[in-house]
Design a protein with these regions (language model features):
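Polytopic transmembrane helical bundles with strong interfacial aromatic enrichment
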Residues: 2-521
Length: 521
């Protein structure tokens, strides 16, 4: 992969842009699938327990919207997986044995499970018993959640690669422990934080659609009961999302400290570091962090970041400059400087090339074990050998800084929203005098999606320049393609995904607009 040191930078940019485009569009559909699956399961359970036609009609209505969204999620997800082979073939070669395993399990087990039971859920109302149909609805949601588990396991491994070992004979990383990969603490935290956030989106969606009906004075009983269920789901999910987000922050601080420093625009670390609430970070320019100091017009919570990252008020949190220059940890171990890591990375690349050359000439060469041992020592810094300048190791601070605040700010607002609408739904009679609340529900829907996408932006852009944290930089993961061809497919996908999005929104709006509970009976 040494030729990748001179690869066209525009190819990397277009490949990243295309993957980001596909992922962002895909994530517009996935969270609603997971969120609605839970709520429609609860509604059908109400039908099973009461036998009331009202609950059956309500469950069928939300299942129709679920179906439209489910189909779009599948379509965009398939394209996303193919991009690993087309645009990121070096990545696929280097770690395909590990990364491919959870994706294969997801496709063989989880996707077939949800695809099977979603058919029963849609077409089995008059053909199977109420109990079997209820089980099919819940199993559809369970299958979708299991799919999310394996996909998030794969993504978490990119953030925190464990359970693997580099084989110099094949120039590939090979899995040494499936359980370490599947049950990585990073994967567990990421799964619960992501899935609980999708329940929030599902709850907001139900509140927004129900709010529209109440504004139009239509299907008011269905809307009221839907809001009651959605508000409870939303409150519980919001609390869980915040709690799991806290756990995730600790893991990020331990395994991706540069990401945390970028999220906080923290240039110089220390003990008892404050958490920035707001600051004036230029969104169009990487700040000059080398001069130290802090972002202008900063309002911060004393000791907040240390509490968030270490759960200690006086905990040490490294800043960008600490990570670039090297520092001594609390346990006495030393974090190498950027230049030291880059030097050891270049040595690993050189040692690997020498090992391969000797192995090809004489597989019994006595120098091979010594080279293999040296490579093993330097392999943790292998990816740094492809970094030309220490500045490349710093993610784009403005995007990470603002995206994190959008995620947290909207998340906090959502908690307040669910508390208010839940109070109105359960303690008062929802009437036209709460029109402002229904309008608020409609406004919260796009804000919720914005927060969800912002979370993924922090997760992925904050990892840059790495495709796999500390192991493989993006520049070494990309396929050797013409940048023009990738640019062309970028705009092709942009048009295709936009058409799919417009089609979904149009179909959903038509289903919502044309729904009439009396005609369903």
């Amino acid at each position: 992969m040494t030729h990748l040191l001179t690869i066209d930078p525009t190819l990397i940019d277009w490949s990243r842009a295309q993957f980001a485009l596909t992922a962002i569009y895909h994530w517009l559909f996935v969270p609603l699938t997971l969120g609605l699956a839970l709520i429609m399961g609860i509604m059908e359970t109400c039908y099973y327990r009461t036998g009331k036609q009202f609950w059956k009609d309500t469950a069928i209505f939300w299942q129709r919207l679920f179906g439209v969204n489910f189909a779009m999620g599948v379509a965009t997800g398939i394209i996303l997986e193919f991009e690993f082979g087309s645009n990121w073939s070096n990545y696929s070669w280097f770690v395909g044995d590990i990364f491919g395993a959870p994706l294969a399990i997801e496709g063989i087990v989880a996707f077939f499970m949800e695809s099977t039971f979603v058919a029963v859920m849609y077409f089995g109302w008059q053909k199977v018993s109420r109990g079997f149909h209820l089980a099919s609805t819940w199993l559809t949601g369970l299958g979708a959640t299991i799919s999310a588990w394996w996909i998030l396991v794969a993504n978490a491994w990119m953030q925190y690669p464990v359970g693997c070992e580099f084989n110099p004979d094949t120039v590939r990383n090979e899995m040494t422990s499936f359980m370490d990969v599947a049950l990585s603490p990073f994967a567990v935290d990421k799964f619960f934080h992501t899935v609980t956030s999708t329940w929030v989106i599902g709850a907001v969606f139900v509140c927004a659609v129900s709010g529209w009906y109440l504004l139009k004075r239509r299907e008011q009983e269905m809307a009221r009961q839907s809001i009651k269920i959605a508000s409870i789901v939303g409150i519980v999910a919001s609390v869980l999302t915040m709690a799991t987000g806290d756990f995730s922050a600790v893991k990020v601080a331990e395994t991706q400290p540069m990401k945390l420093a970028a999220m906080e625009a923290l240039y110089d670390g220390g003990e008892g570091v404050a958490l920035t609430a707001v600051a004036a970070v230029n969104p169009f320019q990487q700040p000059d962090y080398s001069k130290g100091g802090e972002a202008p017009l900063r309002i911060a919570i004393p000791n907040g970041l240390s509490l968030l990252a270490t759960h200690k008020a006086d905990g040490f949190v490294p800043g960008v400059n600490d990570l670039l220059n090297g520092y001594t940890r609390a346990d006495g171990t030393r974090e190498l400087s950027a230049e030291e890591k880059m030097e050891r990375g270049r040595r690993a690349i050189s040692t690997l090339a020498e090992y391969r050359k000797l192995k090809a000439a004489d597989a019994n060469d006595k120098r091979l074990p010594e080279l293999a041992e040296q490579l093993k020592l330097d392999m943790p810094y292998f990816g740094y050998g492809y970094i030309k300048d220490r500045a490349e190791l710093v993610p784009y601070i403005p995007v990470n800084f603002y995206a994190f605040r959008v995620m947290v700010g909207v998340g906090t607002l959502l908690m307040l929203f669910f508390l208010v609408i839940g109070h109105v739904a359960w303690r008062k009679n929802i009437t036209s005098k709460y029109r402002w609340l229904y309008v608020a529900a409609l406004v919260m829907l796009p804000l919720t999606y914005l927060a969800s996408e912002a979370g993924w932006i922090v997760a992925e852009l904050g990892r840059q320049p790495w495709a796999i944290q500390d192991m493989l930089p993006t520049v070494a993961a990309v396929s050797d393609l013409k940048s023009g061809s990738v640019a062309f497919t970028f705009f092709l996908f942009l048009v295709l995904f936009t058409v799919l999005l417009v089609a979904e929104v149009s179909i959903m709006c038509r289903v919502i607009r044309n729904y009439n509970a009396e005609k369903q009976q």
